Amino acid sequence: MKKWMAAVFVMMLMLCFGGIENVKAAEPKVYQFDFGSGSMEPGYIGVRASDRYDRSKGYGFQTPENMRDVAASGAGVKSDAVQFLAYGTKSNNTFNVDLPNGLYEVKVTLGNTARASVAAEGVFQVINMTGDGAEDTFQIPVTDGQLNLLVTEGKAGTAFTLSALKIKKLSDQPVTNRTIYVGGDSTVCNYYPLNSSKQAGWGQMLPHYIDKHTFQVRNMASGGQIARGFRNDGQLEAILKYIKPGDYFMLQLGINDTNPKHKESEAEFKEVMRDMIRQVKAKGADVILSTPQGRATDFTSEGIHSSVNRWYRASILALAEEEKTYLIDLNVLSSAYFTSIGPERTLGLYMDGDTLHPNRAGADALARLAVQELKRQGIAGF
């Protein structure tokens, strides 16, 4: 009798866990999806644009009629993709995966795209990935038993495509690790490939100087951004969804805000920045304001680099004092460094023919100066 019961038990286990295509069956710690109509790579679950979400499988597209299989120019999982024909952070045209509640690491591999962002759970997760086959990784807590993700703008009028997803469970607790969120413009944002791009923002290089066992860095900066846009267009919303006590929000804006085409006065800039500071502090997190560095050519005839009157710097200094935030006067710190190395070497830290945007070495130097200043001030965690 005992042997018969044991045999029945084994058969039940086989029925429950036998289906490799059912992501819910064995509740693996890692889920890998290969999107598109091409051949499926080993170790991945193949997903076509027509695959509608099915509770019995535990994955699929919410509205497959708004998806399309497309080719991609890479190899392996990067050889094909799916295109999102409907998009937006609030769109229901999502790829859904049933997951036990907890904290997950999600690696996203795009198909062919000029510039696209990744959204999940109704907010941006990665901003403006560029180039064919671009890859990035982010942490996300799952609290309702399902991850809902899509690829979205990006650059209007271009294709938003997804080649592969790798989802890895980190913890049973649906809370992000301690995080430094970064806001800013093209001198701060990420460029792709992250580990080898010629151009870089200092937010991209920040992890080189941060203890990864203490913090993760989430860079939500984007090229061309102004304070009003960062607050109103979804980037601040994404930060406010997850930021918590013990986290930091590093914010550097002002360069594009001074451009007359944006019709943003210095007074408006200051009040929008103040509003963002207060919203973040209401979540129990700390704010670190940073003043933008100057141009490579801001040298006097005596060889002194100085740009203290650029980019609404005075308003940023005043805000730090009025709102009791931390401050990195990166404008002055970088000028002192540029003066020490001279005009020629300073120019070598910027993109060719461009006196505003740092190259990879320049962004690395700015990130190093920023973290050195935080350590000098004795700010917790640095």
From Swiss-Prot:
<dbReference type="GO" id="GO:0016787">
    <property type="term" value="F:hydrolase activity"/>
</dbReference>
<feature type="active site">
    <location>
        <position position="354"/>
    </location>
</feature>
<keyword id="KW-0732">Signal</keyword>
<dbReference type="InterPro" id="IPR049033">
    <property type="entry name" value="AGA-YXIM_GBD"/>
</dbReference>
<dbReference type="InterPro" id="IPR037459">
    <property type="entry name" value="RhgT-like"/>
</dbReference>
<dbReference type="InterPro" id="IPR036514">
    <property type="entry name" value="SGNH_hydro_sf"/>
</dbReference>
<dbReference type="InterPro" id="IPR013830">
    <property type="entry name" value="SGNH_hydro"/>
</dbReference>
<dbReference type="Pfam" id="PF13472">
    <property type="entry name" value="Lipase_GDSL_2"/>
</dbReference>
<keyword id="KW-0378">Hydrolase</keyword>
<feature type="signal peptide">
    <location>
        <begin position="1"/>
        <end position="25"/>
    </location>
</feature>
<feature type="active site" description="Nucleophile">
    <location>
        <position position="186"/>
    </location>
</feature>
<dbReference type="InterPro" id="IPR008979">
    <property type="entry name" value="Galactose-bd-like_sf"/>
</dbReference>
<dbReference type="Pfam" id="PF21254">
    <property type="entry name" value="AGA-YXIM_GBD"/>
</dbReference>
<comment type="similarity">
    <text>Belongs to the 'GDSL' lipolytic enzyme family.</text>
</comment>
<protein>
    <recommendedName>
        <fullName>Uncharacterized esterase YxiM</fullName>
        <ecNumber>3.1.-.-</ecNumber>
    </recommendedName>
</protein>
<feature type="active site">
    <location>
        <position position="357"/>
    </location>
</feature>
